[in-house]
């Protein structure tokens, strides 16, 4: 389960499209948001209907911070990890943000280079 921040605004459809695209690539990977239409609450019935008892949590967030450490992987009763464990799943959390990997870091640096070049023009 990939945890995205989400939004209550019109951009929430982008998260839904992202989740649909990911599901076409791998039906065992889900995208849910902290805010929006597709949340952990809406995903839990689907997870329960699938065979398997292990869930991996992955943050779709730039950096690891409060949302990853508390909202996703924390021990509190509202954390996704805690809620999944209460639902009977064995849960593991990956504590690396998108910027920790080379792909997104390189993508952002290329965009930054373009923006700086445009300022010089």
Identify what each model region corresponds to.
Residues 1-121:
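Extended amphipathic ligand-handling, pore-lining, and cofactor/metal-binding catalytic surfaces
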């Amino acid at each position: 389960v990939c945890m995205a921040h989400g939004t209550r605004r019109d951009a929430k459809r982008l998260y839904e499209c992202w989740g649909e695209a990911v599901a076409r690539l791998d039906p065992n990977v889900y995208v849910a948001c902290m805010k929006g239409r597709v949340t952990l609450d809406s995903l839990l019935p689907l997870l329960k209907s699938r065979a398997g008892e292990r869930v991996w949590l992955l943050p779709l967030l730039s950096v690891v911070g409060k949302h990853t450490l508390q909202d996703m992987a924390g021990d509190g009763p509202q954390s996704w990890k805690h809620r999944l464990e209460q639902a009977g799943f064995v849960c593991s959390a990956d504590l690396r943000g998108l910027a920790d990997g080379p792909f997104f870091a390189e993508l952002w640096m290329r965009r930054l280079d373009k923006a700086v070049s445009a300022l010089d023009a």
